[in-house]
Amino acid sequence: MSDSPILIIGAGISGLVLAQYLQRHNVAFKIFDRDSAIDARSGGWGLTLHWSLPALRELLPEHLVTRFPETFVNKEASARGDTGRFQFFDLRSGDALYNIPAAERIRVSRARLRQLLTTDIDVQWNKNLQSIESTADKITAHFQDGTSSTGRLLVACDGARSRTREILYPDVQMNQLPVQLLGASTLYSAEELGGVESIDPFIFQGSHPESNVFLFFSFLDTPNNFENSSKDRYHCQIIISWADSKEIPVPDANAERIALMNKLTDNWSEPFRSLVHKLPGDVEVRSIRIEDWMFRLGREHAHPRAVLMGDSAHTMTMFRGEGANNAIVDVLDLVTRVDMCQPSSFDSGALLSSLAAYENDVFTRAEPSFLNSRQACLDAHDFSKIEGSPLVGSRELKKSD
């Protein structure tokens, strides 16, 4: 059984980091993803990596660590040691109310980070998990294309809409939060930004004290950042959100969504108002219903050699940027508890004990992040609650005892 592979379901951040660790230590594995290719999905998101950076450096081979700058949304700012202020603004007055401190953090393109993490990794694409079959010492993943793969451990890294989680816990439902979000990404020139690039090289956020409509702004790329970057324009992500209590339905038509964004932000101060009002008429506006979910300790399932990791274990709101950081440390916790290089680690009794310890580590660390992220989401849409909220609090690693 020592040659039996680790099965990784999902080639997101945690799945690829785990794959890199296993490859570095010559441990057999297979990694599968439901997408047709790494760039199958359009649209860009940025990730802020802070308290997970030591774990990430420990897990990855040095030659990938040295290539981190290939993922930066603003290499120039990062090179000069600028970690950003991550300010929170009163969108009526334009005043900066809070800075979010961090000893160390980098802002990366999720797409570029995934590209880096696939280096020398053979991802099997177009693999939609259909079912799982278990015996005492093996676990088999069956895919919709009729193929299957058997291993000694299955690690579910298949995200917020985890098929693995559905199989393990068929009665579980995501928690819908009373918040609606509209988001778009576009290219703006420095002139169109109106000085926004001087506020922060990475991200900022804010809310209007009367309407309680929230703004999240981030740079996804900057001029001349990479060879394929725009020479004179900034790639920007613009998100606005509001509470369901405002009873504002989201229209289906894209043009009507842009019109709604303009209406909701019409009383914002500059330059924040123009960030929304200058959106091109043909930009795609995505509607997202905010949801979260957190696994519970001690919940039994039929597949003891399967374990959840990353968003499949703890789907968090985006309002503290802690999901990816927890996912990375999940990997370190797993390989700390399960000695992947030692065949006896996969004996049934030893593995069950190690996975229970891993789940306890994850729950102890991630539950506070999960709860803080939920509270930050709710507070973002009630200006009176922002003072002292996790929305503007520091981000730090909670270590297990």
Regions found by a protein language model. Name each.
Residues 14, 37, 161:
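Conserved Rossmann-like nucleotide-cofactor binding loop
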Residues 41-45, 249-252, 319-322:
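Short, solvent-exposed loop/turn segments at secondary-structure boundaries
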Residues 18, 374-401:
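C-terminal helix/juxtamembrane-tail motif
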Residues 2-6, 49-168, 173-187, 247, ...:
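Conserved N-terminal helical subregion
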Residues 18, 41, 134, 164-167, ...:
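Short glycine-/acidic-enriched loop or helix-start segments at secondary-structure transitions
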Residues 8-28, 32, 155-156, 182, ...:
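Conserved mid-domain beta->alpha element of the FAD-binding
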Residues 36-55:
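Conserved N-terminal glycine-rich FAD pyrophosphate-binding loop of Rossmann-like flavoproteins
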Residues 87, 91-105, 109, 183-283:
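Conserved FAD/dinucleotide-binding core of flavoprotein oxidoreductases
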